[in-house]
Amino acid sequence: MTPLKEQLERLVSEMVSKGIRYEDAHREFEKKFIAYILSQSNGNLGKAADLLGMHRNTLSRKIAEYRLRRGA
C-alpha cells in the first residue's frame, strides 16, 4: 500500500470511529481541496477550474456554497 493510501486508511478509520458521516467528510474534503487550489491559482477561477477538472460555473457555485474567498 502506498503512503498516501495508508494515510487515507488511518484517516477514514479515525473518522468512522468518531461517528463522522460520509456526507460531512465529503463536504469538508471538497471545501479544503477547493480552497487549496484557489490559493495555488491566486484566485484565478479559470486556472482553478482547470486544475480541479470542473466548469467555472460549477466552481463559482461551490465557492459561494462553501463561502470561500477567491484568494483564500
Regions picked out by a protein language model, each given a short descriptive name:
Residues 2-72:
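Bacterial C-terminal helix-turn-helix
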